[in-house]
Curated annotation (Swiss-Prot):
The modification Omega-N-methylarginine is found at R4. Belongs to the SNF8 family. InterPro entries: ESCRT-2_cplx_Snf8, Snf8/Vps36, WH-like_DNA-bd_sf, WH_DNA-bd_sf. Signal peptide: none annotated. Changing V102I: In NEDOA; likely pathogenic; fails to rescue defective embryo development in a zebrafish disease model. This is Vacuolar-sorting protein SNF8. It is found in: Cytoplasm; Endosome membrane; Nucleus; Late endosome membrane. One of its GO terms (cellular component) is transcription regulator complex. It is linked to Developmental and epileptic encephalopathy 115: A form of epileptic encephalopathy, a heterogeneous group of early-onset epilepsies characterized by refractory seizures, neurodevelopmental impairment, and poor prognosis. Development is normal prior to seizure onset, after which cognitive and motor delays become apparent. DEE115 is an autosomal recessive, severe form characterized by onset soon after birth. Affected individuals show massive reduction of white matter, hypo- or aplasia of the corpus callosum, and neurodevelopmental arrest. Death in the first year of life may occur. It comes from Homo sapiens (Human). GO terms for biological process: early endosome to late endosome transport; endocytic recycling; macroautophagy; membrane fission; multivesicular body assembly; multivesicular body sorting pathway; positive regulation of exosomal secretion; positive regulation of gene expression. Component of the endosomal sorting complex required for transport II (ESCRT-II), composed of SNF8, VPS25 and VPS36. SNF8 is essential for the stability of the ESCRT-II complex. ESCRT-II interacts with ELL. Interacts with TSG101 (via the C-terminal domain). Interacts with RILPL1 (via the N-terminal domain); which recruits ESCRT-II to the endosome membranes. Interacts with 14-3-3 proteins.
Amino acid sequence: MHRRGVGAGAIAKKKLAEAKYKERGTVLAEDQLAQMSKQLDMFKTNLEEFASKHKQEIRKNPEFRVQFQDMCATIGVDPLASGKGFWSEMLGVGDFYYELGVQIIEVCLALKHRNGGLITLEELHQQVLKGRGKFAQDVSQDDLIRAIKKLKALGTGFGIIPVGGTYLIQSVPAELNMDHTVVLQLAEKNGYVTVSEIKASLKWETERARQVLEHLLKEGLAWLDLQAPGEAHYWLPALFTDLYSQEITAEEAREALP
């Protein structure tokens, strides 16, 4: 027996049903979007009330400030996005991170002749705290990272390089690719690295290792020690702390400014 073909009426009915399902789906999606938008507005209002109530604690307590920033991030609010507006006027965070950014630049410039423009986050944190004095608003490493990201967005040459369990802060516009970053990570343990160590650990050819090290030397990020036993050592001054035993004075920071 031959199967009967589907009639025009059945096809039209099927298309009508599909159109209704599609229309219903659109209505549901719009309802969900409206509900989410309403919840988001309510959450933002509650966040503003929370900020108003706890603004002193947000400004003074670094840990509390981190938690507040995370709360803001969940709804896409960035208190640092502008120097003006509700958040900066209420909390003063715009001015806080602007001033912190200026201080970071001053410290990095003052130390540039020692470290070539690379400094660990821990060392930067210590130097910033020294410069602020004991009566100034407390600053956390998270605050530093947020301020540096703002500096980076301005095209100032600042960057953040993950190294082991910490970060190196780059304050010069040197171009560093993945090879350079891997070598910096390798040098973290001793503060220096050799061509042989790179070849053994990373399985690189000699020329590749030399090119990376020569670039770091050229950018002033590494020092070459030809008197070291065995073979030349390439020291990364940002990774050893003997150079930072002296506190940076205010005069030294000012002299470093252009």
